[in-house]
From Swiss-Prot:
PANTHER family: ARGININE BIOSYNTHESIS BIFUNCTIONAL PROTEIN ARGJ (PTHR23100), ARGININE BIOSYNTHESIS BIFUNCTIONAL PROTEIN ARGJ, MITOCHONDRIAL (PTHR23100:SF0). The gene is argJ. SUPFAM superfamilies: DmpA/ArgJ-like. This is Arginine biosynthesis bifunctional protein ArgJ. Its EC number is 2.3.1.35, 2.3.1.1. It is found in: Cytoplasm. It comes from the Bacteria. InterPro entries: Arg_biosynth_ArgJ, ArgJ-like_dom_sf, ArgJ_beta_C. Gene3D superfamilies: ArgJ beta chain, C-terminal domain, L-amino peptidase D-ALA esterase/amidase. Belongs to the ArgJ family. Catalyzes two activities which are involved in the cyclic version of arginine biosynthesis: the synthesis of N-acetylglutamate from glutamate and acetyl-CoA as the acetyl donor, and of ornithine by transacetylation between N(2)-acetylornithine and glutamate.
């Protein structure tokens, strides 16, 4: 077994290959297979109403609470391709199911890459044959994590060791990150023996406070998908709280790695809001600031410009006392009661990590944190070139 990643838990194998879908010639297809003895599965998907064909197919197939294998391709999102896109997604599922001796409904499928281009089905089907060839499936979690990358600069794996059972995972995504997950594909695996209901509760709880609070550029992908597959191979059934904690730890670690590798990132920024009526209002306010381009530019310039924070948060759908707002950068007060604090302009933000804390002054119990990044020259360069 691997020390980390999707094949760290018992009962899982993976493979990866280069099918020629990516123009770069880098590996671009991966396969994760649950060998059992159990096949419980949970998933969460994008909330974007314009969702990709693989999201539609995976939603249908996971509805019965079981998935035995998940197919990944990178370099083509198979999104906004109409009926042909759905036909292609279903064809890939059928091809894989036939090769593995499974039913179509046993398969999840995930795609990431450019929107609006048809899948090269000849390459995809040949890639499926390579992924399922004799000897291909094994302890190849690291290779699978590399194969699903698009504009990522590093692969992202995790592992959480519990009391006799394990949660592993891989993820990708560095841009188009906003609430409702990110341009993000994540696969979590566990050898715990759990029901589908337990898995869904753990996954939903974890994503709500990890991936859903990662907001790099305010864009929500058409393809966001997080799977949690459970093999039961450890023979151990954790409590719901134990499962929740392990899945949260895995999601939190991957989310931190997504933030650290965000497109063009030079600053990792945590925006925390307190002092509003409830947590929903707090996250609205934190997200409003995290998405503000002037604020993000100030972070890029290591500029403790608290005025941009106030200007942004004042537009948030949250209860606040406009004359009692306080702002702290790295625990140093820069604004108290909506007025500049002594030494505010001298606060050092030259480090890579910046914590921003905003108190909206109502004495309410709402609080939330959103993770974001700065807005750099490199981000613009990367995304101006990522097209046809």
């Amino acid at each position: 077994m691997a020390e980390k990643g999707i094949t760290a838990p018992k009962g899982f194998v993976a493979s990866a290959t280069t099918a020629g879908i990516k123009a770069s010639g880098n590996p671009d297809m991966a396969l994760v297979v649950n060998q059992g003895p159990e096949f419980s599965a949970a998933a969460v998907f994008t909330r974007n109403r314009v969702f990709a064909a693989p999201v539609k197919v995976s939603r249908e197939n996971v509805a019965d609470g079981q998935i035995r294998a998940v197919l990944y391709n990178a370099g083509n999102a198979n999104a906004c391709n109409g009926l042909q896109g759905e036909k292609d997604a279903r064809e890939s599922v059928s091809h894989l199911a036939q090769n593995l001796g499974l039913e179509d409904s046993d398969i999840g499928v995930c795609s990431t890459g450019l929107i609006g281009e048809l899948l090269p089905m000849d390459k995809l089907n040949a890639g499926i044959d390579q992924l399922t060839a004799e000897g291909a499936l094994g302890d190849n979690g690291a290779a699978a994590a590399k194969a699903i990358m698009t504009t990522d600069t590093v692969d992202k794996e995790t592992v959480v060791f519990a009391d006799g059972w394990t949660v592993g995972g891989m993820g990708k995504g560095v841009g188009m990150m906003a609430p409702s997950l990110a341009t993000m594909l994540v696969c979590l695996t566990t050898d715990a023996s759990v029901t589908q209901e337990m898995a869904q509760i753990a996954l939903a709880n974890a994503t709500a406070v990890t991936f859903d609070t990662l907001d790099i550029d305010g864009s929500t992908s058409t393809n966001d998908t997080v799977f949690l597959l459970a093999s039961g191979a450890s023979g151990i059934t954790p409590t719901q709280d134990e499962l929740n904690d392990a899945v949260y730890a895995a999601c939190s670690d991957i989310a931190a790695k997504l933030q650290a590798d965000a497109e063009g990132v030079t600053k990792r920024v945590a925006v925390t809001v307190v002092g509003t009526t409830n947590n929903e209002q707090a996250i609205n306010a934190a997200r409003t600031v995290a998405r503000d381009n002037l604020f993000k530019c100030a972070m890029f310039g290591s500029d403790p410009n608290w005025g941009r924070v106030l200007a942004a948060v004042g537009m948030a759908d949250a209860d606040m006392e406009p004359e009692k707002i306080s702002v702290f950068f790295n625990d140093k007060a820069v604004c108290l009661d909506s007025t500049g604090a002594p030494g505010a302009r001298e606060v050092d933000l030259s480090g890579a990590d910046i914590d921003v804390r905003i108190d909206l002054g109502t004495s309410g119990e709402g609080q939330a944190t959103v993770r974001t990044t700065d807005l750099s020259f490199s981000y613009v360069e990367i995304n101006s070139a990522y097209s046809t």
